[in-house]
Amino acid sequence: MSDFIESEAEESEEEFEEKDLKPKKTQRFMEEDEEEEEENTEDQDEHGNLRGLIDDDDVEEEEEEERGEPPAGEDSDSGEEVRHRRRKRSFDDYLDDDDLDLIEENLGVKVKRRKKKYSRVKTMDDEGDDDDEKDLIADEIFTGDGDGEGEVEDGEAVDTLHPRDDEEEEDDEESDIDDFIVDDDGQPITKKKGKKFSGYTDAALQEAQEIFGGDFDFAEFDTEAYDHAEEEEEDQDDESWDRPKKQTKRRVSRRSIFEIYEPSELESSHMTDQDNEIRSTDMPERFQLRAIPVKPAEDDELEEEAEWIYRNAFSTPTISMQESTDYLDRGTTTNFSRKGPSTIAKIKEALNFMRNQHFEVPFIAFYRKEYVEPELNINDLWKVWQWDEKWTQLKTRKQNLTRLFQRMQSYQFEQISADPDKPLADSTRPLDTADMERLKDVQSIDELGDVYNHFLLYYGRDIPKMQNAAKGGKKKLKKIKEVSEEDGEEAEVEEEEEEEEQKGPDLKQASRRDMYSICQSAGLDGLAKKFGLTPEQFGENLRDSYQRHETEQFPAEPLELAKDYVCSQFNTPEAVLEGARYMVAMQIAREPLVRHVLRQTFQERAKINIKPTKKGKKDVDEAHFAYSFKYLKNKPVKELSGDQFLKMCLAEEEGLLAIDICIDLVGVKGYGDQTYFDEIKQFYYRDEFSHQVQEWNKQRTLAIERSLQQFLYPQMAKELKNKLIAEAKDNIVKSCCKKLYNWLKVAPYRPDQQVEEDDDLMDESQGKGIRVLGVAFASGRDTPVFCSLINGEGEVVDFLRLPYFLKRRNAWREDEREKKQQDVENLKKFLLSKKPHVVAVSGENRDAHMVMEDIKRTISELEQNSSLPVVGVELVDNELAVLYMNSKKSEADFRDYPPLLRQAVSVARKIQDPLVEFAQVCSTDDDILCLKLHPLQEHVVKEELLSALYCEFINRVNEVGVDVNRAIAHPYTQSLVQYICGLGPRKGSHLLKILKQNNTRLENRTQLVTMCHMGPKVFINCAGFIKIDTASLGDSTDSYIEVLDGSRVHPETYEWARKMAVDALEYDESAEDANPAGALEEILENPERLKDLDLDAFAEELERQGYGNKGITLYDIRAELSCRYKDLRAPYRPPNTEEVFNMLTKETPETFYIGKLITCVVTNIAHRRPQGESYDQAIRNDETGLWQCPFCQQDNFPELSEVWNHFDSGSCPGQAIGVRTRLDNAVMGFIPTKFLSDKVVKHPEERVKPGMTVHCRIMKIDIEKFNVDLTCRTSDLSDKNNEWKLPKDTYYDFDAETDDVKQEEEQKKKQQRTTYIKRVIAHPSFHNINFKQAEKMMESMDQGDVVIRPSSKGENHLTVTWKVADGIYQHVDVREEGKENAFSLGHTLWINTEEFEDLDEITARYVQPMAAFARDLLGHKYFHECNGGDRKKMEELLVRTKKEKPTFIPYYISACRDLPGKFLLGYQPRGKPRIEYVTITPDGFRYRSQIFPTVNGLFRWFKDHYQDPVPGVTPASSRTRTPASVNATPANINIADLTRAVNSLPRNMTSQMFNAIAAVTGQGQNPNTTPAQWASSQYGYSGGSSAGGGGGSSSAYHVFATPQQPMATPLMTPSYSYTTPGQQQAMTTPQYPSSTPQSSHGHHQHSSSTPSSSSSRVRTPQPKASSHTAVDWGKMAEQWLQEKEAERRKQKTPRMTPRPSPSPMIESTPMSIAGDATPLLDEMDR
């Protein structure tokens, strides 16, 4: 392009030097402009810029001129050339603010302001530090800038559309799209080169008007061109394009095309000069548009690249499990196992065709099959094309980095040469050939990044010095160049130096420094080198997995050595060692070999752990996509599949999940304990046992650990994450392509038999091909149906509007029936007159069934009555049609049509030719992305997805071929032309434009060159895919008609085709009248003659003559001569049942499946009609004497005969069998009666009413009937045993989920406890506050003061809080009875079993006595704080006192904060302290179950009896432990069922006792019983054991399973009576949490507890129990139940807390009564 600009610019300069060419009128306008500009000079600086605005580009150019340097990127251009180009650019016509203001004023709309585009290279500030320098060098390496390979490579990775030379990029930094505007003849219409605008044709004007709808005269541009050019030339020095506003009078009537239209519009319409260059260049358009240009390559490089592509693209497996979605291969295989090493040679051939011969993929796939098949199919060739781009990028970056290495090597050599005797500093690391070799061996971008980061670590600080040194040697180099101008190498060096000089003056050292630089400047390099191994040696040890290099031991201890390095930054030896370890860790982490080994190991071993966030716990339910991996533990990344990881990352982005990728197993003990760190640290060890070696080993270990944990692991995890995301996205792109492939592979609809038409009835405009009637409708029943008839060419011939066609034939209203009939008659007339071959009905919703039935019925009547030929009726998916209906293209094509009629047209065209219709949505608006190709398609890079989808179009369009003449005649097919091999949107439209301008058809392929001026490369690529209908041309042309132009035979093989025809007909080629063309025509009529040819011998002969291997091509030619351009697409077939269901419901198997939770609306109750033989089953109620209908259960019939009349009259609806519902997607649902509820439902109408919305779960889907069976039973909806929910991941962390569920439940209970109902109670001590507020209030109150507040237990409870001591408050539960309403105070108040009249009595009789007793203890001489009654503190105090006075028995009393109302009584008679509790009651002090009214009496008795055994502590106490159930509180026991169970027990208890209970309760220990059955049979069981159900072992009833448990006389340890709620939780039996350890995993069997657990003994019947005949177990159990029932009557508000609480037997003992005054459990838990 630069040559083009140069030539154009030179020409334009010559023209503008002639002043005579400037019209006078233009001069006058210019003078006015100059005068007005002078008036506004006060706001401008000396350069004409608005004050405060800086034009960096001008400033930079001026500086460069002063320095005599060309701008960056123009290596060898002289200053004259730079100025030359700047002059050329001076005629750019930018729209300044005045222009935009004027346009806005005239048009009345806001105009998009121009922004800087394409300015990719930023100038460096002179004060830039070396960080900026590093960034610049990284940019140079990784974007390809400054490549010495030639101008073509420069800037290659930057601009996907316009690969421009660096010199142009740099110079045109402020350029915009306006620079590139051309008309469609390729004539530049900007004033960039100051050229005349004399090249506009009527065609250009027409084209612009067609595109933009504008009406303007190009002729006006000619004179204005001079005017603008001169203005720009004169104003260039005074102002930049960012000019200040001027009140200049502009000529609004004459404006150029780029003044009228937005640059973005011009670009999207391909009207820029880049587009023109693409059109005119003889190279396939897609080659020119590739982000990284296609470059020619030598054979050696092709060999190397082919191996690289084979290794990376075809033989290396993906990290995650990605199935091959290459639908062109048979079967689903992994994407690397099918290609053998022979593929490499085929890849090399393909690369040779692409890079050196510029053949596009379809051409290679169709016309060079011998060189790529069978290893490579067309999709593989596209993959080679994509990987070639990656290879080129990698190669370029390697070359850039190699140059940087070489420059650094030269710099180091110069530094060392300056003083050869000076020893190398510790911080200096020579850049040697090993480093260069390592760079040469780099095989991936990751490895290249490793090498570059390694370089920066060691040489980053030297880069500024190197640059400055390079500038210093510039003059010498120039002199050398002058002496030897012909030496190309020296010239290259000089160019490189110039590049560096352009960066600015001498670079300063960085002011910002990282930790490594600080350590380096402190001189810690020396210490770091004494760790024993270099990073390279450690890397080799790691690679070989053994200690290849022994660790060298420095003969001094680390701390001693570190003292020599102490400095201001590191002022202690420990800090020095820390810094040295940091340096070693960083060096190891940057070592490329270490990173390479670790990268491989990390990817092999990496595991994913996932936990939900707080938001995720709430939001991720079973309907959420992240449900199956909400909790994951140690899932190997290798077992990720498809797009799973992308879903994980999306959930993480939404803040739902936290993902952790690590190399070691998490939370696994006993297996896999050894971490990767433990494995590799031995490679940095010295295996000796001296103290010195051990100290160094410790330092090495810490360095390795830091290197892994701080640097390598996070970086590798990030890298791996990006790769996994890329693989998942690639999977999505492939899935989208596969779906589009399946849509495009369908051939046009063909009727079963060609219908012979009556010429009189048919209009000529109908055309050949099949006629289709498209039918479209909307979802509302009141909307009209639109029909559109298209002819064989896809053009709309006629249409019909049927406003009432959606009404039902048997509608209730007569006028609707009549209107429907009228529409049917109209349709009949239309069908009779137009005779379509097929009717295509839009698959909008379930109404499509009804529409199809009505149309079929109508056609059937016409076939019988009017002899209408057979007309097919097909259902067509309308997704594409709806998209087309709403697109801009449909509005442009059918501006006057209503949207539904446009949809009808698209439906008809889709069945006529899917490929053409899908191409309609491939517009610049990217409408094709609106098709539902994949649920996650919007998370893929749009450009990548578009590119892949367009490849599918390219493949299919070239297989089918494109008739260019048809595209001109029928514009709606023009969208196919852009996909022809070698062409594109620009070249395709240009081809059509030339043909339109010449007003001619393409009569043969030769005209592509002669008339359309196509270059040889593009012609070879596209010729075979452009088909010409030679039969239709016939006698209408004088040109030579080549019959092979209508076939897939490529022009390069026409001679062989003729030869085959001549040989097949056995003509004599040497005869004078031999006519190969005639032979061809004869063969086309009798293709079977070709079967006798020996094509293999022909192929051998061709190869011998040097034409190459053409074996497959010859067979293709024979096939083509047998049937020219035979359609290879799959024949059309009607959609199957599943496709119809998905089409009409708009569901997919992923969105609608068995087990899904849905909502539906009840429509009615379904009844089964009564059968005649069932009439005699009427039932008579003996109490009322009335009869009941056996079906509808109506029970008010006085006589049996009335029941029969009820049957006969039809008033009996029948037996209710279920509920009918309707889902949102119009599918009908049915809920059988037994699935309405877990309880028996006789009358469904009592449960649900029509119109009610119910939550259900899908049990069965009938896709044929559009029906689903549903359940709305609570057990099925909750689905605790995962019978219906989607399966969870194999590595799902059920334990973590169970723990979280438990925590959440406890949290909820705490929250529920803190809530209370505000009460209206008039009492000075009453406050509407919660317990926290109460305790805060009491902080400032005196001991014994009272606060009365609402209780969290409910509206019939109050809580009395009194202050026991500082920081200790007791909460007493008060139960109210006889309440008038929820807010008033009850008439009687109860504390446990004691009744009070009012709150004052409670204060006086209950609280104040206790407060007085508490004061007595608080004032006792042996009272001690002990930190709020801390047992440990008490024990320490006793031990200390005993030591001081060994002959005394010390004792102390202390108020207990954990158990308010209790005091610790500690004493130490001998060696071990003992601690007991004294409880405050209103009656006195309770100690060892006795009440003492005074303190003296208490301690007197204590001193006398302290040696007595504590009553109740007997071995029998263990028998009374709580059964192994979380919920085994008395409130959970169903007394009625339990009594029934007890009554059924045998008198003499035997080992079958449990079975007898199980028979009654239905709760046998059947291991096959599912948790769902347990849940339904355990009344009051809330499933607290686990999320997945805990099996039967947690049933409260299992306590009766063991005969040795004497339930009639339960014993109780005194420790229970003293236990307050806070301790009950701690002292409950240990078997609760462990009773069902596996339950959370859904293993439905009884888990046994630990051997120590009493529950395991409880559940084991022992044979000797049967000998206990003296005990009447039935009576005992009955007696126990009666006691329990009496207790329940006393306490009418049972506590429902599912936490462990004391066993039911405890409260029945007489001893526990006194202990009931203790605070409540839930008050203490808060």
Swiss-Prot record:
Biased composition (Acidic residues): 1-18, 31-45, 55-79, 93-104, 146-157, 166-186, 219-240, 484-501
Biased composition (Basic residues): 110-120
InterPro entries assigned: HHH_9 (IPR041692), NA-bd_OB-fold (IPR012340), RNaseH-like_sf (IPR012337), RuvA_2-like (IPR010994), S1_domain (IPR003029), SH2 (IPR000980), SH2_dom_sf (IPR036860), Spt6_acidic_N_dom (IPR028083)
Protein family (similarity comment): Belongs to the SPT6 family.
This protein's encoding gene: supt6h
Keyword Membrane among record annotations: no
Protein name: Transcription elongation factor SPT6
Superkingdom of origin organism: Eukaryota
Function in brief: Histone H3-H4 chaperone that plays a role in maintenance of chromatin structure during RNA polymerase II transcription elongation. Promotes the activation of the myogenic gene program by entailing erasure of the repressive H3K27me3 epigenetic mark through stabilization of the chromatin interaction of the H3K27 demethylase KDM6A. Plays an important role during early patterning and somitogenesis of the embryo.
All residue ranges annotated as the S1 motif domain in the record: 1204-1273
An annotated GO cellular component: transcription elongation factor complex
UniProt modified residues of type Phosphoserine: S90, S1525
Residue numbers bearing the Phosphothreonine modification: T1522
One Pfam assignment: S1
Keywords, ordered alphabetically: Chaperone, Coiled coil, Nucleus, Phosphoprotein, Transcription
Presence of the UniProt keyword Nucleus in the record: yes
Species annotation: Danio rerio
Gene Ontology MF terms in the entry: DNA binding; histone binding; nucleosome binding
GO BP field: embryonic heart tube development; heart development; nucleosome organization; otic vesicle development; somitogenesis; transcription elongation by RNA polymerase II; transcription elongation-coupled chromatin remodeling
SMART domains (alphabetical): SH2, YqgFc
